[in-house]
């Protein structure tokens, strides 16, 4: 006999799946949507209650999207199978939010670039540096994660940045890095790294178009600030 409580064990009018069929997915709470994905609860706790606890223990949806396997399996009742479902759902959501007609995406403003990386980078617990590669028409031809750690001009080497740009025959690049604090205000080191990479790009004939600093749902463009 199985001890796991399933959605079907709930009263019919409380079953998330039945409510979704009847009222549409938009009528379900976050816990109910997660319950539909996970399917079964645990001994003594139905899936809606477990889902609600998972969301709360991770600090809400933003925490869900930025937690890892270790974070999830540390929650009572969440094994690797359930954690894998949540991680897959979160990753698919991130990719969908950044999807812009595949390769046919033109960067016309800092906002256009920020859309591509915001959902992935806004809640990262470490600093990540990404480079968006553009062709002569400002179309995106690639996005590469080139560095993890605190941005420092003595550590961030132009070789890693421009290796991918040269390999992809990029005409220009946009740098993007996050501040785990959520505050995108540029530090002196951010500015120093930017100037150094700009000079290197000029020597190589690859323009550094902008450097975006990503915070929690907000960003700063060094170009718009007149720094670049």
UniProtKB/Swiss-Prot annotation:
Residues forming coiled coils: none
Alphabetized CDD domains for the sequence: MPN_DUF2466 (cd08071)
InterPro entries named in the record: MPN (IPR037518), RadC_JAB (IPR025657), RuvA_2-like (IPR010994), UPF0758 (IPR001405), UPF0758_CS (IPR020891), UPF0758_N (IPR046778)
Domain MPN: 106-228
Residue interval(s) of motif JAMM motif: 177-190
Record bears the keyword Protease: yes
Swiss-Prot/TrEMBL GO biological process terms: proteolysis
Entry keyword annotation includes Transport: no
Sequence positions that bind Zn(2+): 177, 179, 190
Molecular-function GO term, any one: metal ion binding
Pfam families: RadC, UPF0758_N
Keywords, sorted A to Z: Hydrolase, Metal-binding, Metalloprotease, Protease, Zinc
NCBIfam families reported in the protein's UniProt record: PRK00024.1, radc
Entry's family note: Belongs to the UPF0758 family.
The protein's name in its UniProt record: UPF0758 protein CKL_0865
Source species: Clostridium kluyveri (strain ATCC 8527 / DSM 555 / NBRC 12016 / NCIMB 10680 / K1)
